[in-house]
Each structure stands twice: as C-alpha cells, then as structure tokens.
C-alpha cells in the first residue's frame, strides 16, 4: 500500500495538473503550460514541509487561494490601463467637437456676405408687417374665422404666420433664406397693400415731408386766430352800436352791392349813376328803422371800424367786434344784414376811396311827399360793418 506522503504528493500533482485547463486563466493572459508544470513540481515541497511539521493542510485550497490572489492582482491593473486608454480618446473627441463649434461660430461671425446684409436689410424693411400678422394670428386663435375656414386650414394658416413672423424677427439667418424671404415679401404686399403703400411713400418722400413741414405750421398759425372767434359766444360778438354824428372809417372796401331797405313796404331804389348820397332828418323821420345789406364777394380783405356805440340786439348775420379786424373766408358771397334805428339828428356819410360815388333818389311814403320834399345830395361815409 502507498504511504500517506505518496498519496498527498499524488493528490497535489493531480490538482496542479487540472489548473491549466481553466478558461479563466486563459482569458486574462496567464503564463504557458510548461511554466505551470514546473510550478506544480516544486509545489509539493511546502506540503511535505508542513507534513513533516505535523500539520496536514489541504493543498487544494492553498492553490486556489494563491491562484485567486494572483488572478485578482493581475486583473486589477488591467482596468486602469483600459480606463487610461479610453479617457484620452473621449477627451480628444470632446475637444475636437468643441473646436469645430468654435470654428463654425467664428466663420459665421466673421464671414458676412452681401447676401447676408441684404437679408438683414429686407427683414428690417418688413418689420412693419409684424403687427398685422400678429393681429391675424390672434384672430385665428380666438376663432374669428371659424365660419370661413376649416380647422385644418386654420392650423395651417397659424403655422405659416408664426414661421413668417419668426423669420422677420431673425435678420441674422443669412443669405441661405433670401429667396424664401423675397417670396414672403411679395405675399405680404399682396395681403396688406395699404402697409406696402405706406412704406413706399414714407421711404421715398421723407425730404418732401421736411419741405412741407414749415408750410403746415404757417397754415395752422394763420388759421389759429380765427378759431377763438368761432368759439366765442354769439351774444358777445353780436353787439353793434351806433352813435350820432360819429363817422365810420373804411380802409379797404371790397366789391359789393348796397341796398337800403325801409321798414315800411316801399320800393328799394336800384344803384344808379355815380354821385353822392346823404341822409338827414329831412327825408327820414325820427325813429325810422332801416337795414343795411352788404353782399361781399371773393377776395375780401380784412377791414376795421371804430366807433363808440350803443348795443343793438344780435342778428342772424355774423357779427363784428368794434376795433378788431375780421377775416372773411372766400368761399362765396356773404350777406350781412344789420337793422338799426336812426335818431332825428343822425347823419350818415358815404365816401370810400375805392367805392365810386353813387347818386340816388329816395322815395318815402306816398308820391306826394316825394314831390314836396326833393332829395338832397351830399357826400357820405359808409359804415364799416
């Protein structure tokens, strides 16, 4: 029979010979089979030494522990190598991507072509179409066009309008979308012709506006003095007064026709050959009421009058303030009728420089009174009404 030492050596040898077939060792690149046999031949020495010392440890677990330690020691340094080799590759890829992005950004910022400038200019010109487009978009969102458009058409219209507004708000998009922007420009001018007309008029006639600007100020300044008079109360403007033996002066008298109307139903004598006219208390009785009607034509220039007066009830005609100029619009002939009452000692003269003197015969009452009282001719001065 075999001795225990031979059995132990045989068992240790068999265990050592079984390790080279392990796939784990071959995966991690362990040493060759010859080296493992040499290690197995020298392996029983520690067992025999332990056996001589009286201890019988199992050689298998020792071998397994040793192999496991070696495998762990050999496996752990392999991971740092792989990690170290992978990390530089990842870092280089990130650096390359960042460098590429920087280069593209620099190229886009530095290289601006004429097309890019034209695109930006067109976007700025079409900025005026953004408010009506947004109003149209809001109307679509609120359902203002539900009767005329289907839901699909409304969604498509909203999408198109949003894209157009987005393009107009980004003038830095560049030459790439210039053709599309030109098509959008034609479409917007078709949709909103009034805005296109306003832009063309504003762009082409700025210097004309600056030239016409002072003229508008002068027109407004010329029309401003007349506006307070129109706003004033008629009662304040309608008081006209006459004082006996106080002449009325006329600076520049326009072309007009004069008609004297008596309160009693008598015939009004027409204008006759040049001469002079005078009224005294002879032909007209005391307290006789007369009316003066002035027909003013185009080209009327402002005239003034000055005389202390007594108030007379306002009339339907436009009144005049004594001592202040009055401007009449040249829209057409105007009629001014001012009824007055003549006292017994009142005299009325008519002698304007530009108005020819007229000779007239007044008929008052019955023809018998006209025969008994012949008309008297004298120089006269006309009221400036």
Curated annotation (Swiss-Prot):
Its main location: nucleus. It holds the Pfam family Ciart. Residues 70-79 have a biased composition (Polar residues). Keywords: Biological rhythms, Nucleus, Repressor, Transcription, Transcription regulation. Residues 1-108, 203-233, 365-385 are annotated as: Disordered. GO terms for cellular component: nucleus; PML body. It is found in: Nucleus; Nucleus, PML body. One of its GO terms (molecular function) is E-box binding. Transmembrane segments: none annotated. Residues 1-26 have a biased composition (Low complexity). One of its GO terms (biological process) is locomotor rhythm. Residues 33-45 have a biased composition (Basic and acidic residues). InterPro entries: Ciart. Interacts with PER2, CRY2, BHLHE41, HDAC1 and NR3C1. Interacts with BMAL1. Transcriptional repressor which forms a negative regulatory component of the circadian clock and acts independently of the circadian transcriptional repressors: CRY1, CRY2 and BHLHE41. In a histone deacetylase-dependent manner represses the transcriptional activator activity of the CLOCK-BMAL1 heterodimer. Abrogates the interaction of BMAL1 with the transcriptional coactivator CREBBP and can repress the histone acetyl-transferase activity of the CLOCK-BMAL1 heterodimer, reducing histone acetylation of its target genes. This is Circadian-associated transcriptional repressor. It comes from Homo sapiens.
């Amino acid at each position: 029979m075999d001795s225990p030492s031979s059995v132990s050596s045989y068992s240790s040898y068999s265990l050592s010979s079984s390790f080279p077939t392990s796939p784990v060792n071959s995966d991690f690149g362990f040493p060759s089979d010859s080296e493992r046999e040499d290690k197995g031949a020298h392996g029983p020495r520690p067992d025999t030494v332990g056996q001589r010392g009286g201890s019988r440890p199992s050689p298998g677990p020792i071998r397994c522990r040793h192999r496991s330690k070696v495998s762990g020691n050999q496996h752990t340094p392999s991971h740092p190598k792989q990690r170290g080799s992978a990390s530089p590759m990842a870092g280089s890829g990130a650096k390359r991507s960042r460098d590429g992005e920087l280069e593209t950004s620099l190229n886009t910022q530095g290289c601006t072509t004429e097309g890019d400038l034209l695109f930006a200019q067109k976007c700025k010109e079409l900025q005026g179409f953004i408010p009506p487009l947004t109003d149209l978009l809001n109307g679509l969102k609120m359902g203002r066009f539900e009767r005329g458009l289907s839901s699909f058409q409304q969604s498509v219209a909203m999408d198109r309008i949003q894209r157009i507004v987005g393009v107009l708000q980004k003038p830095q998009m560049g030459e790439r979308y210039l053709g599309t922007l030109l098509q959008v420009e034609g479409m917007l001018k078709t949709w909103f012709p009034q805005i296109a007309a306003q832009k063309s008029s504003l762009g082409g006639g700025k210097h004309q506006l600056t030239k016409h600007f002072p003229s508008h100020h002068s027109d407004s300044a010329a029309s401003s003095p007349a506006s307070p008079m129109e706003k004033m109360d008629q009662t304040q403007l309608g008081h006209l007064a006459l004082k006996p033996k106080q002449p009325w002066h006329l600076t520049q008298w326009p072309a007009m026709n004069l008609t004297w109307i008596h309160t009693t139903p008598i015939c009004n004598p027409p204008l006759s050959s040049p001469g002079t006219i005078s009224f005294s208390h002879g032909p007209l009785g005391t307290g006789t009421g007369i009316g003066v009607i002035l027909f003013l034509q185009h080209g009327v220039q402002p005239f003034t009058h000055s005389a202390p007066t007594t108030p007379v009830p306002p009339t339907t005609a436009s009144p005049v303030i004594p001592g202040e100029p009055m401007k009449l619009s040249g829209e057409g002939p105007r009629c001014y009728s001012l009824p007055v009452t003549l006292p017994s000692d009142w005299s009325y003269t008519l002698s304007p420089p530009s108005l020819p003197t007229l000779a007239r015969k007044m008929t008052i009452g019955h023809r018998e009174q006209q025969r008994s009282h012949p008309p008297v001719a004298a120089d006269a001065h006309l009221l400036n009404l």
